[in-house]
């Protein structure tokens, strides 16, 4: 059985409240779970200590048993110092594409040609 530590939504319409639960990965989001290990209330201010509540001992126990936290829960655990989250780094994504580089080179070449033509015109006028 693949276990996940994930969020189960509660609360009313437009007022979300989440329980952090350990559940079988195949069960529905708000369906059957094995144990409640915390809660998250996104309606509270970010600096409010009640915004994220975690039962550290239970979470460590379930992670030792092989439960995998989802991305959002992993962020909470990393913030609390219960798990490490790999730093995301994709420097190639920030680079401009091939066509954009061609356009920049073309624009630079036109600017150099225009400057050279202006210099030649200025020297010919003297």
From Swiss-Prot:
The keyword Ribosomal protein applies. Residues 87-126 are annotated as: Disordered. It comes from the Bacteria. One of its GO terms (molecular function) is structural constituent of ribosome. GO terms for biological process: translation. InterPro entries: Ribosomal_bS16, Ribosomal_bS16_dom_sf. The keyword Ribonucleoprotein applies. Keywords: Ribonucleoprotein, Ribosomal protein. GO terms for cellular component: cytoplasm; small ribosomal subunit. Residues 99-113 have a biased composition (Basic and acidic residues). Residues 114-126 have a biased composition (Low complexity). Belongs to the bacterial ribosomal protein bS16 family. This is Small ribosomal subunit protein bS16. It comes from Agrobacterium fabrum (strain C58 / ATCC 33970) (Agrobacterium tumefaciens (strain C58)). The gene is rpsP.
């Amino acid at each position: 059985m693949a276990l996940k530590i994930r969020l189960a939504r509660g609360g009313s319409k437009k007022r979300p409240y989440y329980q952090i639960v350990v559940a079988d990965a195949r069960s529905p989001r708000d369906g059957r779970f094995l144990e409640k290990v915390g809660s998250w209330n996104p309606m509270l201010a970010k600096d409010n200590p009640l915004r994220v509540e975690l039962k550290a001992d239970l979470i460590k126990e379930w992670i030792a048993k092989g439960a995998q936290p989802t991305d959002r829960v992993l962020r909470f655990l990393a913030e609390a110092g219960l798990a490490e989250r790999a730093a995301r780094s994709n420097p190639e994504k920030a680079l401009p594409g091939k066509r954009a580089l061609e356009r920049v080179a073309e624009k630079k070449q036109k600017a150099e040609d225009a400057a050279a033509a202006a210099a030649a015109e200025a020297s010919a006028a003297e």
